[in-house]
């Protein structure tokens, strides 16, 4: 009951008739977060693309300048020297054939997966397990690579992966509620820049149709996705 009351009170602080500048949205999100734990701050975009068409798929990665606030558990499929290098770089789980079998049976105690190219023939059969969770290694996201050290370091350092879903929505995290507001906005700016860079040439009309920022269990805050400059400014003087 208390949680419901808190949620209603938080929701009442959000003006649904406007789109907030990123800095304002972050401040409001922090203010309306009511969880006892350090919640995650997430952004959702509704994109003007048709993901059923290969030339309108939006998928990529970005290294958030201030990380995500969470140390990802990384699984690496590798053998020999590359397996040893992955372990030395801080990979949490490393293996090959036996590990592939474990994952096929449902082992999912990890947040990211990296594989060397020579093992992808075997890892490929895990598509039904890893695919729906967005964990399938892919050369385009740097997770199928002989350089497992770089891949592990990138992921541990705050690299996030994003992919438009079948409903044309794209979600990504920008940090924790405890983050300084400037760091959250700078993380958002880095992700936004990369997503804009990846706009498919085949996509027509408005690219980002709707944007929302929210914390774990917090209200969704309408975000002005057209704001691509001066993100650390509350509002454009001309629009006040």
UniProtKB/Swiss-Prot annotation:
Q: How does it assemble?
A: Part of the 50S ribosomal subunit.
Give a yes or no for keyword RNA-binding in this entry: yes
State which residue ranges cross the membrane: none
Biological classification of the source: Bacteria, Bacillati, Actinomycetota, Actinomycetes, Kitasatosporales
Instruction: Write one Pfam family the protein is assigned to.
Output: Ribosomal_L1
What is the species of this protein?
A: Streptomyces griseus subsp. griseus (strain JCM 4626 / CBS 651.72 / NBRC 13350 / KCC S-0626 / ISP 5235)
Return the CDD domains for the record: Ribosomal_L1 (cd00403)
General function of this protein: Binds directly to 23S rRNA. The L1 stalk is quite mobile in the ribosome, and is involved in E site tRNA release.
Q: Which InterPro entries match?
A: Ribosom_uL1_bac-type, Ribosomal_uL1, Ribosomal_uL1-like, Ribosomal_uL1/biogenesis, Ribosomal_uL1_3-a/b-sand, Ribosomal_uL1_CS
Q: Which family does it belong to?
A: Belongs to the universal ribosomal protein uL1 family.
Q: Please give the name of this protein.
A: Large ribosomal subunit protein uL1
> Quick one: a GO biological-process term for this protein?
regulation of translation
């Amino acid at each position: 009951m208390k949680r419901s009351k808190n949620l209603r009170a938080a929701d009442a602080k959000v003006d649904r008739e406007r789109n907030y500048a990123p800095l304002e949205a972050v401040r409001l999100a922090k203010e309306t977060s009511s969880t006892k734990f350090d919640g995650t701050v997430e952004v959702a975009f509704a994109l003007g693309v048709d993901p059923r068409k290969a030339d309108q798929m939006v998928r990529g990665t970005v290294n958030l300048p201030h990380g995500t606030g969470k140390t990802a558990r990384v699984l690496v499929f590798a053998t020999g020297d590359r397996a040893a290098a992955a372990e030395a770089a801080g990979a949490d789980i490393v293996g090959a054939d036996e590990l592939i079998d474990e994952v096929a049976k449902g082992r999912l105690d990890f947040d990211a997966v990296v594989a060397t190219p020579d093992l992808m023939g075997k890892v490929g059969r895990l598509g039904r397990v890893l695919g729906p969770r967005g964990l399938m290694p892919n050369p385009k996201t740097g997770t199928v690579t002989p350089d497992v050290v770089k891949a592990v370091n990138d992921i541990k350092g705050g690299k996030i992966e994003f992919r438009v879903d079948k409903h044309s929505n794209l979600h990504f995290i920008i940090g924790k509620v405890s983050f300084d507001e400037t760091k959250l906005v700078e993380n958002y700016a880095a992700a936004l820049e990369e997503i804009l860079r990846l706009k498919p040439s085949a996509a027509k009309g408005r690219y980002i149709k709707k944007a929302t920022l929210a914390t774990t269990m917090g209200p969704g805050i309408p975000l002005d996705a057209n704001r691509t400059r001066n993100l650390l400014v509350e509002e454009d003087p001309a629009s006040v």
